[in-house]
A protein has these predicted regions:
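Conserved short beta-strand edge segments in small beta-sheet-based binding/regulatory domains
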Residues: 421-429, 469-484
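Short edge beta-strands and adjacent turn/loop segments
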Residues: 429-440
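Short, flexible active-site recognition loops that position polar ligands and cofactors
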Residues: 452
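Short amphipathic alpha-helices in soluble, non-transmembrane regions
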Residues: 407-413, 461-469
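Inter-lobe coupling/hinge segments of SF2-like helicase ATPases
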Residues: 1-405, 409, 417, 424, ...
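Basic/aromatic recognition patch in beta-strand/loop cores that engages polyanionic ligands
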Residues: 442-445
Length: 487
């Protein structure tokens, strides 16, 4: 049996449950955080049949089994299953294909399934199984309260409503979870005198201010530098942080509740499996009063004592132009909300937003994933967006942007020639090359080209013919990704 989880920090909890339930079975773990020797032992154990249960992350989808009989993909909607570098396969889709070829069942589990999976379930391609009750029978859904950020005072980090709710929760000796998917202290430093901003010299992005190390860090290329003593633009002494991240929330909470035991969990301060496991164990054992974190704390964890969840900075996803942004925003809010009241405690979720009238919050208040998903599918169908079309993304990275765009224009010309020889253009549409949203990363300029097909078969047929022509001519400067999740 293969059990997949999207992130390494979800492994210990699932491993413990599997070992307790299948006490007589040998269970092994496979993920990128393990030493090479231990990964090899786990791989060989399932390959030789000495272990019959494998718990792992994306890489485990490729493990060799003597007689695989069942695949379970937990949190199947999670973006972590689709790699952004190297071999850009989806561990979820690979698992489905592997199960089909072996004639075995595959279970895709999620409280917020991807719209692709939900569409297949609605059409009958997948069998839909719904849990009729919660693991704790007396558990009630958390009450949703929206905090209109348009009423916040200038420079205010947390609203009065959030402060009052946190204070009341601490008085009850229950735990608070504060979610913000932004690391660092603030996403940018700015000079109010001349407008200078902490731009990365190697990327078309800003460097994030990390106050604990007094450094500016680019989260795209990793470039790091010390915070300048004065503005590099005009020499002014006052350089101010703009926006909030996990470190700023942690500092503000420390000022407001200095006696509260607080813990920040993100990739900056927990970089190893051992330290992360210890941190989550402290939360489970009640040694933490206020937990602050990013996606690392948003899903899968069974926090028994959390009765208040605070969600910050969700608006960036609500107004994004990414076709999947609202789907991911709703999934994030549902998943984070699900950390509250898991042991039957009366719970509440506070969301800070400038768009309290957005219909997405009505669905969230009723925990109505089905209603939200069905509405989104209607919109996607109307707009001709996935899962009603199938996409591929061709990207080019060059020293200069014109070179990257020119390489893609040549690929377009080649594609149009192939299309002209196919009935109805092969059922494929080729769009114009455009610069990527973040154009430059690590001194490489990036451009992309979107290809859409009416069916998966038509898209793949075209891509096979296309790659045979453009592949040898690209010199390795092109990357093709089928079913892209990031644009």
């Amino acid at each position: 049996m293969l059990l997949l989880v999207p992130e390494i920090n979800l492994t210990p909890q699932l491993e413990e449950r599997v070992r307790s339930h299948f006490a007589d079975e040998s269970v092994v773990v496979l993920n990128s955080d393990l030493p090479d020797a231990q990964r090899a032992r786990s791989w060989l154990a399932v390959h030789e049949g000495r272990a019959r249960i494998l718990v792992g992350t994306r890489m485990a989808a490729l493990a060799s089994f003597r007689q695989l009989a069942l695949i379970v993909v937990d949190e199947e909607h999670d973006l972590s299953y689709k790699g952004g570098d190297g071999a850009r396969y989806s561990a979820r889709d690979l698992s489905v294909k592997r199960a089909q070829s072996l004639g075995i069942p595959v279970i895709l589990g999620s409280a917020t399934p991807s719209l692709e999976s939900w569409s297949r379930a609605r059409s009958g391609s997948y069998r839909l199984l719904t849990l009729s009750h919660k693991a704790v029978s007396k558990a009630e859904p958390p009450r949703l309260r929206l905090v209109d950020t348009r009423t916040l005072k200038k420079g205010e980090v947390l609203s009065e409503e959030v402060k009052e709710a946190i204070g009341a929760t601490l008085q009850k000796h229950e735990q608070v979870l504060v979610y913000i998917n932004r690391r660092g202290f603030s996403p940018v430093l700015m000079c109010p005198s001349c407008g200078w901003k902490s731009a990365c010299p190697h990327c078309s992005a800003f460097m994030v201010f990390h106050k604990d190390t007094r450094s500016l860090v680019c989260h795209h290329c990793g470039y790091t530098q010390r915070v300048p003593a004065r503005c590099p633009g005009c020499g002014a002494a006052d350089i101010l942080p703009v926006g909030i991240g996990t470190q700023r929330i942690e500092e503000e909470i420390g000022k407001l509740w200095p006696d509260a035991r607080r813990l920040r969990i993100d990739r900056d301060n927990f970089k190893t499996k051992r330290s992360t496991d210890k941190a989550f164990q402290d939360v489970h054992e009640g040694k933490v009063d206020i937990l602050i974190g990013t996606q690392m704390i948003a899903k899968g964890h069974d926090f028994k004592k959390v009765s208040l969840v605070v969600i910050l900075n969700i608006d960036s996803q609500l107004i994004s132009t990414d076709v999947r942004a609202r789907e991911r925003a709703f999934a994030t809010m549902m998943q984070v909300s699900g950390r509250a009241g898991r042991a039957g405690l009366k719970s509440e979720v506070l969301v800070e937003t400038a768009f309290p009238d957005d219909e997405i919050f009505t669905f969230l208040a009723h925990q109505d994933y089905q209603g939200f998903a069905d509405q989104m599918l209607k919109i996607r169908k109307r707009d001709g967006a996935p899962p009603f079309v199938y996409q591929a993304l061709l990207t080019s990275e060059q020293k200069e942007l014109p070179q990257a765009l020119e390489l893609l224009r040549h690929a377009v010309e080649t594609g149009l020639e192939i299309q002209s020889k196919l009935p109805d253009g092969g059922g494929v549409a080729i769009y114009d090359p455009v610069p990527m949203t973040i154009v430059k990363v690590a001194n490489r300029n990036r451009a992309q080209l979107l290809i859409e097909g009416r069916t998966h078969r038509e898209l793949l047929q075209f891509l096979r013919a296309w790659v045979q022509v453009i592949g040898p001519c690209s010199g390795g400067a092109l990357t093709l990704e089928v079913d892209p999740q990031r644009y």
